[in-house]
Protein backbone atom coordinates (compact mmCIF):
# COMPACT_ATOMS: atom_id res chain seq x y z
CA UNK A 1 0.00 0.00 0.00
CA UNK A 2 3.01 2.29 0.16
CA UNK A 3 2.96 2.28 -3.63
CA UNK A 4 -0.62 3.58 -3.57
CA UNK A 5 0.32 6.54 -1.39
CA UNK A 6 3.36 7.63 -3.40
CA UNK A 7 2.94 10.43 -5.87
CA UNK A 8 -0.58 11.28 -4.76
CA UNK A 9 -1.19 13.86 -7.43
CA UNK A 10 0.08 11.56 -10.16
CA UNK A 11 -1.92 8.49 -9.20
CA UNK A 12 -4.98 10.14 -7.78
CA UNK A 13 -7.03 9.74 -10.93
CA UNK A 14 -5.78 6.17 -11.26
CA UNK A 15 -7.06 5.35 -7.80
CA UNK A 16 -10.44 6.90 -8.49
CA UNK A 17 -11.03 5.24 -11.83
CA UNK A 18 -9.43 1.81 -11.39
CA UNK A 19 -10.13 0.61 -7.86
CA UNK A 20 -11.85 -2.57 -8.96
CA UNK A 21 -8.67 -4.54 -9.91
CA UNK A 22 -7.24 -3.88 -6.46
CA UNK A 23 -10.03 -5.92 -4.89
CA UNK A 24 -8.45 -9.06 -6.36
CA UNK A 25 -4.98 -8.57 -4.88
CA UNK A 26 -4.29 -11.32 -2.35
CA UNK A 27 -1.65 -9.28 -0.50
CA UNK A 28 -4.23 -6.66 0.47
CA UNK A 29 -6.18 -9.25 2.41
CA UNK A 30 -3.00 -10.29 4.15
CA UNK A 31 -2.44 -6.68 5.18
CA UNK A 32 -6.02 -6.41 6.41
CA UNK A 33 -5.66 -9.56 8.47
CA UNK A 34 -2.41 -8.53 10.11
CA UNK A 35 -3.33 -7.32 13.59
CA UNK A 36 0.09 -5.77 14.13
CA UNK A 37 -0.11 -3.35 11.22
CA UNK A 38 2.01 -0.26 11.72
CA UNK A 39 -0.42 2.62 12.35
CA UNK A 40 2.09 5.33 11.56
CA UNK A 41 1.49 4.99 7.84
CA UNK A 42 3.64 2.04 6.79
CA UNK A 43 1.37 -0.40 5.02
CA UNK A 44 3.78 -3.29 4.40
CA UNK A 45 4.11 -5.36 7.58
CA UNK A 46 7.42 -6.99 8.32
CA UNK A 47 5.74 -10.19 9.39
CA UNK A 48 2.36 -11.57 8.41
CA UNK A 49 0.70 -13.11 11.45
CA UNK A 50 -1.75 -15.79 10.35
CA UNK A 51 -3.98 -17.47 12.90
CA UNK A 52 -5.15 -21.06 12.78
CA UNK A 53 -8.65 -20.24 11.49
CA UNK A 54 -7.52 -18.13 8.51
CA UNK A 55 -6.38 -19.55 5.20
CA UNK A 56 -5.11 -17.58 2.23
CA UNK A 57 -6.13 -20.51 0.06
CA UNK A 58 -9.74 -19.73 0.97
CA UNK A 59 -9.22 -16.12 -0.04
CA UNK A 60 -7.76 -17.12 -3.41
CA UNK A 61 -10.63 -19.53 -4.07
CA UNK A 62 -13.15 -16.83 -3.22
CA UNK A 63 -11.43 -14.38 -5.56
CA UNK A 64 -11.35 -16.92 -8.38
CA UNK A 65 -15.04 -17.64 -7.78
CA UNK A 66 -15.83 -13.93 -8.09
CA UNK A 67 -13.84 -13.68 -11.33
CA UNK A 68 -15.76 -16.52 -12.90
CA UNK A 69 -19.22 -15.44 -11.76
CA UNK A 70 -21.11 -12.37 -12.79
CA UNK A 71 -22.83 -11.96 -9.44
CA UNK A 72 -20.39 -10.24 -7.08
CA UNK A 73 -22.68 -10.85 -4.13
CA UNK A 74 -21.24 -14.37 -3.84
CA UNK A 75 -18.30 -12.76 -2.09
CA UNK A 76 -20.40 -12.70 1.04
CA UNK A 77 -23.03 -15.35 0.52
CA UNK A 78 -21.00 -18.36 -0.64
CA UNK A 79 -18.02 -18.04 1.62
CA UNK A 80 -18.77 -21.26 3.48
CA UNK A 81 -21.98 -22.47 1.79
CA UNK A 82 -23.97 -20.70 4.52
CA UNK A 83 -26.21 -17.67 4.67
CA UNK A 84 -24.58 -14.33 5.24
CA UNK A 85 -26.06 -14.03 8.74
CA UNK A 86 -23.90 -17.01 9.71
CA UNK A 87 -21.00 -16.22 7.42
CA UNK A 88 -20.50 -12.72 8.81
CA UNK A 89 -19.10 -14.30 11.96
CA UNK A 90 -16.65 -16.35 9.97
CA UNK A 91 -13.05 -15.15 9.71
CA UNK A 92 -13.15 -15.60 5.94
CA UNK A 93 -15.91 -13.05 5.26
CA UNK A 94 -14.49 -10.74 7.92
CA UNK A 95 -11.08 -10.66 6.25
CA UNK A 96 -12.63 -10.17 2.83
CA UNK A 97 -14.58 -7.16 4.05
CA UNK A 98 -11.49 -5.72 5.71
CA UNK A 99 -9.54 -6.20 2.49
CA UNK A 100 -12.17 -4.26 0.57
CA UNK A 101 -12.06 -1.58 3.23
CA UNK A 102 -8.28 -1.19 2.87
CA UNK A 103 -8.69 -0.34 -0.81
CA UNK A 104 -11.46 2.16 -0.10
CA UNK A 105 -9.54 3.81 2.73
CA UNK A 106 -6.67 4.67 0.37
CA UNK A 107 -8.88 6.66 -1.96
CA UNK A 108 -10.82 8.17 0.95
CA UNK A 109 -7.59 9.39 2.59
CA UNK A 110 -6.55 11.14 -0.62
CA UNK A 111 -9.90 12.89 -0.96
CA UNK A 112 -10.15 13.97 2.69
CA UNK A 113 -6.61 15.38 2.63
CA UNK A 114 -7.30 17.59 -0.37
CA UNK A 115 -10.63 18.63 1.14
CA UNK A 116 -9.04 19.75 4.42
CA UNK A 117 -6.33 21.67 2.56
CA UNK A 118 -9.03 23.57 0.71
CA UNK A 119 -10.71 24.78 3.90
CA UNK A 120 -8.86 27.43 5.88
CA UNK A 121 -8.57 26.75 9.58
CA UNK A 122 -10.53 23.51 9.47
CA UNK A 123 -9.29 20.62 11.60
CA UNK A 124 -11.71 17.73 11.94
CA UNK A 125 -9.47 15.48 14.05
CA UNK A 126 -8.91 16.51 17.64
CA UNK A 127 -8.88 14.73 20.98
CA UNK A 128 -11.81 14.92 23.35
CA UNK A 129 -9.96 16.91 26.01
CA UNK A 130 -9.68 19.81 23.55
CA UNK A 131 -13.47 20.12 23.44
CA UNK A 132 -13.91 21.38 27.00
CA UNK A 133 -11.53 24.39 26.81
CA UNK A 134 -13.03 25.18 23.40
CA UNK A 135 -16.52 25.30 24.86
CA UNK A 136 -15.35 27.43 27.78
CA UNK A 137 -13.69 29.97 25.48
CA UNK A 138 -16.20 30.09 22.63
CA UNK A 139 -19.65 29.40 24.09
CA UNK A 140 -19.48 32.47 26.29
CA UNK A 141 -19.61 34.63 23.15
CA UNK A 142 -22.68 32.82 21.78
CA UNK A 143 -26.32 33.18 22.70
CA UNK A 144 -27.83 30.24 20.79
CA UNK A 145 -26.82 26.65 20.34
CA UNK A 146 -28.02 24.10 17.79
CA UNK A 147 -28.00 20.54 19.07
CA UNK A 148 -27.83 18.18 16.08
CA UNK A 149 -27.98 14.40 16.14
CA UNK A 150 -26.63 12.96 12.90
CA UNK A 151 -29.18 10.49 11.46
CA UNK A 152 -27.70 7.12 10.61
CA UNK A 153 -30.70 4.98 9.67
CA UNK A 154 -30.22 5.48 5.95
CA UNK A 155 -30.71 3.47 2.80
CA UNK A 156 -27.68 1.80 1.16
CA UNK A 157 -28.28 3.74 -2.05
CA UNK A 158 -27.52 6.97 -0.18
CA UNK A 159 -24.10 5.59 0.71
CA UNK A 160 -23.59 4.57 -2.91
CA UNK A 161 -24.36 8.13 -4.00
CA UNK A 162 -21.82 9.42 -1.50
CA UNK A 163 -19.17 7.06 -2.86
CA UNK A 164 -20.07 8.04 -6.40
CA UNK A 165 -18.87 11.59 -5.76
CA UNK A 166 -15.26 10.50 -5.30
CA UNK A 167 -15.14 7.00 -6.83
CA UNK A 168 -15.88 6.90 -10.55
CA UNK A 169 -15.03 3.27 -11.07
CA UNK A 170 -18.35 1.69 -12.11
CA UNK A 171 -17.47 -1.94 -11.23
CA UNK A 172 -16.38 -0.83 -7.76
CA UNK A 173 -19.67 0.95 -7.21
CA UNK A 174 -21.61 -2.13 -8.33
CA UNK A 175 -19.61 -4.26 -5.92
CA UNK A 176 -20.26 -1.84 -3.05
CA UNK A 177 -23.95 -1.69 -3.89
CA UNK A 178 -24.21 -5.48 -3.79
CA UNK A 179 -22.38 -5.68 -0.47
CA UNK A 180 -24.46 -2.94 1.16
CA UNK A 181 -27.78 -4.38 -0.01
CA UNK A 182 -26.82 -7.85 1.16
CA UNK A 183 -25.69 -6.35 4.45
CA UNK A 184 -29.07 -4.65 4.86
CA UNK A 185 -31.07 -7.76 3.99
CA UNK A 186 -29.17 -9.84 6.53
CA UNK A 187 -30.41 -7.82 9.50
CA UNK A 188 -33.83 -7.02 10.78
CA UNK A 189 -35.24 -3.53 10.75
CA UNK A 190 -34.61 -3.03 14.46
CA UNK A 191 -30.92 -3.90 14.23
CA UNK A 192 -30.29 -1.95 11.05
CA UNK A 193 -28.89 1.08 12.84
CA UNK A 194 -26.41 -0.99 14.81
CA UNK A 195 -25.32 -3.01 11.79
CA UNK A 196 -24.71 -0.59 8.92
CA UNK A 197 -23.44 2.76 10.19
CA UNK A 198 -22.96 3.68 13.79
CA UNK A 199 -19.96 5.16 15.65
CA UNK A 200 -20.14 2.36 18.23
CA UNK A 201 -19.48 -0.48 15.77
CA UNK A 202 -15.99 -1.94 16.02
CA UNK A 203 -15.66 -3.57 12.61
CA UNK A 204 -13.40 -1.82 10.15
CA UNK A 205 -16.00 -1.79 7.40
CA UNK A 206 -18.67 -0.24 9.64
CA UNK A 207 -16.26 2.40 10.89
CA UNK A 208 -15.33 3.26 7.32
CA UNK A 209 -18.99 3.67 6.38
CA UNK A 210 -19.60 5.89 9.39
CA UNK A 211 -16.52 8.06 8.78
CA UNK A 212 -17.39 8.47 5.11
CA UNK A 213 -20.94 9.47 5.94
CA UNK A 214 -19.92 11.94 8.68
CA UNK A 215 -17.21 13.42 6.43
CA UNK A 216 -19.82 14.03 3.76
CA UNK A 217 -22.13 15.65 6.30
CA UNK A 218 -19.42 17.97 7.61
CA UNK A 219 -18.18 18.80 4.11
CA UNK A 220 -21.41 20.64 3.39
CA UNK A 221 -22.52 21.57 6.91
CA UNK A 222 -19.54 23.69 8.01
CA UNK A 223 -19.18 25.76 4.79
CA UNK A 224 -22.96 26.20 4.71
CA UNK A 225 -23.04 27.67 8.21
CA UNK A 226 -20.10 29.97 7.49
CA UNK A 227 -21.64 31.32 4.29
CA UNK A 228 -25.02 31.73 5.94
CA UNK A 229 -23.81 33.84 8.84
CA UNK A 230 -20.98 35.69 7.12
CA UNK A 231 -23.39 36.95 4.48
CA UNK A 232 -25.63 38.52 7.13
CA UNK A 233 -23.05 40.10 9.42
CA UNK A 234 -20.97 43.24 9.29
CA UNK A 235 -18.23 43.03 11.91
CA UNK A 236 -17.59 46.25 13.74
CA UNK A 237 -14.90 45.01 16.14
CA UNK A 238 -14.84 44.70 19.88
CA UNK A 239 -15.72 47.96 21.62
CA UNK A 240 -14.87 48.40 25.31
CA UNK A 241 -18.17 50.18 25.87
CA UNK A 242 -20.15 47.83 23.71
CA UNK A 243 -23.21 47.83 25.97
CA UNK A 244 -23.67 51.57 25.59
CA UNK A 245 -23.03 51.27 21.86
CA UNK A 246 -25.95 48.86 21.51
CA UNK A 247 -28.13 51.06 23.71
CA UNK A 248 -27.37 54.09 21.54
CA UNK A 249 -28.23 52.19 18.37
CA UNK A 250 -31.53 51.07 19.89
CA UNK A 251 -32.20 54.66 20.90
CA UNK A 252 -31.65 55.78 17.32
CA UNK A 253 -34.11 53.16 16.11
CA UNK A 254 -36.75 54.41 18.51
CA UNK A 255 -36.33 58.03 17.45
CA UNK A 256 -36.17 57.36 13.71
CA UNK A 257 -37.98 54.08 13.33
CA UNK A 258 -39.39 55.10 9.97
CA UNK A 259 -36.05 56.02 8.46
CA UNK A 260 -33.92 53.15 9.77
CA UNK A 261 -35.19 49.63 9.29
CA UNK A 262 -34.49 46.86 11.73
CA UNK A 263 -32.62 44.87 9.09
CA UNK A 264 -29.88 47.48 8.96
CA UNK A 265 -29.54 47.34 12.72
CA UNK A 266 -29.10 43.56 12.54
CA UNK A 267 -26.11 44.05 10.29
CA UNK A 268 -24.32 45.72 13.17
CA UNK A 269 -24.46 42.49 15.17
CA UNK A 270 -21.39 40.29 14.72
CA UNK A 271 -22.65 36.79 13.96
CA UNK A 272 -20.27 33.86 14.06
CA UNK A 273 -20.35 30.12 14.68
CA UNK A 274 -18.35 27.35 16.30
CA UNK A 275 -18.78 23.69 15.45
CA UNK A 276 -17.88 20.66 17.54
CA UNK A 277 -18.85 16.99 17.21
CA UNK A 278 -18.37 13.82 19.21
CA UNK A 279 -19.90 10.62 17.84
CA UNK A 280 -23.35 11.32 16.43
CA UNK A 281 -23.86 14.48 18.53
CA UNK A 282 -22.93 17.86 17.06
CA UNK A 283 -23.13 21.33 18.56
CA UNK A 284 -23.15 24.58 16.61
CA UNK A 285 -22.73 27.65 18.78
CA UNK A 286 -24.27 30.70 17.12
CA UNK A 287 -24.48 34.40 17.85
CA UNK A 288 -27.33 36.23 16.24
CA UNK A 289 -30.96 37.13 16.54
CA UNK A 290 -33.78 34.68 17.12
CA UNK A 291 -34.99 35.13 13.55
CA UNK A 292 -31.56 34.31 12.13
CA UNK A 293 -31.33 31.10 14.16
CA UNK A 294 -34.87 30.16 13.16
CA UNK A 295 -34.06 30.68 9.47
CA UNK A 296 -30.84 28.72 9.86
CA UNK A 297 -32.72 25.75 11.36
CA UNK A 298 -35.31 25.87 8.58
CA UNK A 299 -32.71 25.91 5.78
CA UNK A 300 -30.62 23.19 7.40
CA UNK A 301 -33.66 20.97 7.86
CA UNK A 302 -34.69 21.16 4.22
CA UNK A 303 -31.22 21.21 2.73
CA UNK A 304 -30.30 18.01 4.57
CA UNK A 305 -33.38 16.25 3.16
CA UNK A 306 -32.74 17.35 -0.41
CA UNK A 307 -29.00 16.70 -0.26
CA UNK A 308 -29.14 13.20 1.24
CA UNK A 309 -32.69 12.27 0.14
CA UNK A 310 -33.31 11.43 3.77
CA UNK A 311 -36.12 12.33 6.14
CA UNK A 312 -34.69 14.41 8.96
CA UNK A 313 -36.65 13.83 12.17
CA UNK A 314 -37.57 17.16 13.83
CA UNK A 315 -36.26 16.07 17.22
CA UNK A 316 -32.75 15.58 15.81
CA UNK A 317 -32.09 19.31 15.60
CA UNK A 318 -32.93 21.71 18.41
CA UNK A 319 -32.15 25.40 18.78
CA UNK A 320 -31.74 26.50 22.39
CA UNK A 321 -30.99 29.84 23.99
CA UNK A 322 -28.07 29.33 26.33
CA UNK A 323 -29.08 32.01 28.81
CA UNK A 324 -32.56 30.55 29.37
CA UNK A 325 -32.25 26.78 29.00
CA UNK A 326 -29.78 24.01 29.75
CA UNK A 327 -28.25 21.85 27.04
CA UNK A 328 -26.60 18.47 27.52
CA UNK A 329 -23.39 17.44 25.80
CA UNK A 330 -20.71 14.88 26.72
CA UNK A 331 -22.30 14.25 30.10
CA UNK A 332 -22.44 17.92 31.13
CA UNK A 333 -25.19 20.47 31.53
CA UNK A 334 -24.30 23.60 29.53
CA UNK A 335 -25.60 27.00 30.55
CA UNK A 336 -24.43 30.58 29.99
CA UNK A 337 -25.06 33.03 32.81
CA UNK A 338 -24.76 36.79 32.44
CA UNK A 339 -22.75 38.58 35.11
CA UNK A 340 -23.15 42.37 35.39
CA UNK A 341 -20.01 44.25 36.38
CA UNK A 342 -19.57 47.86 37.43
CA UNK A 343 -16.27 49.33 36.25
CA UNK A 344 -15.03 52.68 37.56
CA UNK A 345 -12.56 54.51 35.34
CA UNK A 346 -10.87 57.66 36.58
CA UNK A 347 -9.49 60.12 34.04
CA UNK A 348 -7.89 63.23 35.54
CA UNK A 349 -10.53 64.69 37.85
CA UNK A 350 -13.51 62.89 36.34
CA UNK A 351 -14.84 59.52 37.50
CA UNK A 352 -16.78 57.42 35.01
CA UNK A 353 -18.92 54.43 35.92
CA UNK A 354 -19.54 51.88 33.17
CA UNK A 355 -21.84 48.88 33.25
CA UNK A 356 -20.35 45.81 31.60
CA UNK A 357 -22.02 42.46 31.11
CA UNK A 358 -19.85 39.36 30.86
CA UNK A 359 -20.96 35.83 30.17
CA UNK A 360 -19.86 32.86 32.23
CA UNK A 361 -20.16 29.27 31.05
CA UNK A 362 -21.55 26.94 33.69
CA UNK A 363 -20.68 23.27 33.23
CA UNK A 364 -22.62 21.17 35.71
CA UNK A 365 -22.16 17.47 36.38
CA UNK A 366 -25.44 15.49 36.57
CA UNK A 367 -25.10 14.30 40.18
CA UNK A 368 -28.61 12.82 40.36
CA UNK A 369 -28.05 10.77 37.22
CA UNK A 370 -24.71 9.53 38.57
CA UNK A 371 -26.46 8.48 41.79
CA UNK A 372 -29.10 6.68 39.72
CA UNK A 373 -26.39 4.84 37.82
CA UNK A 374 -24.61 3.87 41.06
CA UNK A 375 -27.92 2.57 42.41
CA UNK A 376 -28.43 0.57 39.24
CA UNK A 377 -24.97 -0.97 39.61
CA UNK A 378 -25.68 -1.82 43.29
CA UNK A 379 -23.24 0.64 44.87
CA UNK A 380 -26.05 2.38 46.76
CA UNK A 381 -29.81 2.33 47.08
CA UNK A 382 -32.27 4.69 45.42
CA UNK A 383 -31.95 7.24 48.23
CA UNK A 384 -28.15 7.32 47.83
CA UNK A 385 -27.26 5.28 50.92
CA UNK A 386 -24.11 3.18 50.26
CA UNK A 387 -24.44 -0.61 50.19
CA UNK A 388 -21.98 -3.44 49.67
CA UNK A 389 -21.13 -4.67 46.20
CA UNK A 390 -21.95 -8.35 46.72
CA UNK A 391 -20.77 -9.46 43.28
CA UNK A 392 -17.22 -8.35 44.13
CA UNK A 393 -16.89 -10.19 47.43
CA UNK A 394 -15.23 -13.13 45.69
CA UNK A 395 -12.32 -10.94 44.56
CA UNK A 396 -9.17 -10.22 46.50
CA UNK A 397 -8.84 -7.12 48.66
CA UNK A 398 -6.44 -5.46 46.23
CA UNK A 399 -8.78 -6.04 43.30
CA UNK A 400 -11.71 -4.55 45.20
CA UNK A 401 -9.69 -1.49 46.19
CA UNK A 402 -8.37 -1.05 42.64
CA UNK A 403 -11.84 -1.24 41.10
CA UNK A 404 -13.32 1.36 43.42
CA UNK A 405 -10.21 3.45 42.94
CA UNK A 406 -10.52 3.41 39.14
CA UNK A 407 -14.19 4.40 39.31
CA UNK A 408 -13.43 7.47 41.40
CA UNK A 409 -10.34 8.43 39.37
CA UNK A 410 -12.35 8.34 36.13
CA UNK A 411 -15.15 10.41 37.64
CA UNK A 412 -12.82 12.97 39.21
CA UNK A 413 -10.76 13.45 36.05
CA UNK A 414 -13.74 13.67 33.72
CA UNK A 415 -15.74 16.10 35.84
CA UNK A 416 -12.75 18.09 37.07
CA UNK A 417 -14.03 21.22 35.34
CA UNK A 418 -17.58 21.12 36.71
CA UNK A 419 -18.83 23.83 39.01
CA UNK A 420 -20.60 21.53 41.48
CA UNK A 421 -17.53 19.93 43.03
CA UNK A 422 -19.41 19.37 46.30
CA UNK A 423 -21.65 16.85 44.56
CA UNK A 424 -18.61 14.94 43.31
CA UNK A 425 -17.24 14.65 46.84
CA UNK A 426 -20.63 13.28 47.88
CA UNK A 427 -20.18 10.60 45.20
CA UNK A 428 -16.72 9.99 46.60
CA UNK A 429 -18.14 9.41 50.07
CA UNK A 430 -20.65 6.89 48.68
CA UNK A 431 -17.93 4.93 46.88
CA UNK A 432 -15.67 5.02 49.92
CA UNK A 433 -18.35 3.68 52.25
CA UNK A 434 -19.50 1.11 49.67
CA UNK A 435 -15.91 -0.14 49.38
CA UNK A 436 -15.66 -0.47 53.17
CA UNK A 437 -18.98 -2.33 53.33
CA UNK A 438 -17.90 -4.69 50.54
CA UNK A 439 -14.70 -5.58 52.41
CA UNK A 440 -16.63 -5.97 55.66
CA UNK A 441 -19.15 -8.27 53.98
CA UNK A 442 -16.34 -10.35 52.48
CA UNK A 443 -14.51 -10.82 55.81
CA UNK A 444 -17.80 -11.01 57.79
CA UNK A 445 -16.88 -8.14 60.07
CA UNK A 446 -17.89 -4.52 60.66
CA UNK A 447 -16.91 -1.32 58.90
CA UNK A 448 -15.08 -0.09 62.00
CA UNK A 449 -12.81 -3.14 61.97
CA UNK A 450 -12.10 -2.65 58.26
CA UNK A 451 -11.15 0.99 58.84
CA UNK A 452 -8.88 0.05 61.73
CA UNK A 453 -7.14 -2.64 59.67
CA UNK A 454 -6.75 -0.72 56.41
CA UNK A 455 -6.70 2.83 57.73
CA UNK A 456 -5.56 5.22 55.03
CA UNK A 457 -5.22 2.44 52.43
CA UNK A 458 -8.84 2.98 51.46
CA UNK A 459 -8.64 4.97 48.22
CA UNK A 460 -4.96 5.72 48.87
CA UNK A 461 -4.15 5.86 45.18
CA UNK A 462 -7.01 8.17 44.32
CA UNK A 463 -6.30 10.52 47.24
CA UNK A 464 -2.62 10.77 46.36
CA UNK A 465 -3.29 11.38 42.66
CA UNK A 466 -5.93 13.94 43.53
CA UNK A 467 -3.57 15.88 45.80
CA UNK A 468 -0.78 15.77 43.22
CA UNK A 469 -3.20 16.89 40.53
CA UNK A 470 -4.41 19.87 42.57
CA UNK A 471 -1.36 21.07 44.47
CA UNK A 472 1.09 20.83 41.59
CA UNK A 473 -0.24 23.84 39.70
CA UNK A 474 -3.10 25.50 41.54
CA UNK A 475 -3.92 26.62 45.04
CA UNK A 476 -7.27 26.05 46.73
CA UNK A 477 -8.31 29.67 46.32
CA UNK A 478 -7.51 29.57 42.62
CA UNK A 479 -9.47 26.35 42.19
CA UNK A 480 -12.64 28.17 43.26
CA UNK A 481 -12.19 30.74 40.49
CA UNK A 482 -10.80 28.66 37.61
CA UNK A 483 -11.43 25.27 36.11
CA UNK A 484 -8.91 22.50 35.55
CA UNK A 485 -9.31 20.29 32.49
CA UNK A 486 -7.46 17.01 32.71
CA UNK A 487 -5.58 16.12 29.52
CA UNK A 488 -5.80 12.39 30.27
CA UNK A 489 -9.40 12.24 29.08
CA UNK A 490 -9.45 10.05 25.96
CA UNK A 491 -13.14 9.13 25.72
CA UNK A 492 -16.47 9.92 27.26
CA UNK A 493 -16.99 8.55 30.75
CA UNK A 494 -19.30 5.47 30.92
CA UNK A 495 -21.48 7.20 33.51
CA UNK A 496 -21.69 10.30 31.32
CA UNK A 497 -22.48 8.14 28.30
CA UNK A 498 -25.26 6.39 30.22
CA UNK A 499 -26.76 9.72 31.24
CA UNK A 500 -26.46 11.10 27.70
CA UNK A 501 -28.34 8.10 26.31
CA UNK A 502 -31.11 8.74 28.82
CA UNK A 503 -31.32 12.35 27.65
CA UNK A 504 -31.54 11.24 24.02
CA UNK A 505 -34.42 8.88 24.79
CA UNK A 506 -36.30 11.67 26.55
CA UNK A 507 -35.86 13.91 23.51
CA UNK A 508 -37.13 11.19 21.15
CA UNK A 509 -40.20 10.56 23.28
From Swiss-Prot:
Q: Name one GO cellular component term.
A: chloroplast
Keywords attached to this entry: Chloroplast, mRNA processing, Plastid, RNA-binding, tRNA processing
The Gene Ontology biological process annotation of the record reads:
mRNA processing; RNA splicing; tRNA processing
The entry lists its GO molecular-function terms as: RNA binding
RNA-binding: present as a keyword of the record?
A: yes
Per UniProt, subcellular location reads as: Plastid, Chloroplast
**Pfam families, alphabetically?**
Intron_maturas2, MatK_N
Note the HAMAP family from the entry. Answer: MatK (MF_01390)
Family that this chain belongs to: Belongs to the intron maturase 2 family. MatK subfamily.
What is known about what this protein does?
Usually encoded in the trnK tRNA gene intron. Probably assists in splicing its own and other chloroplast group II introns.
The name this protein goes by in its record: Maturase K
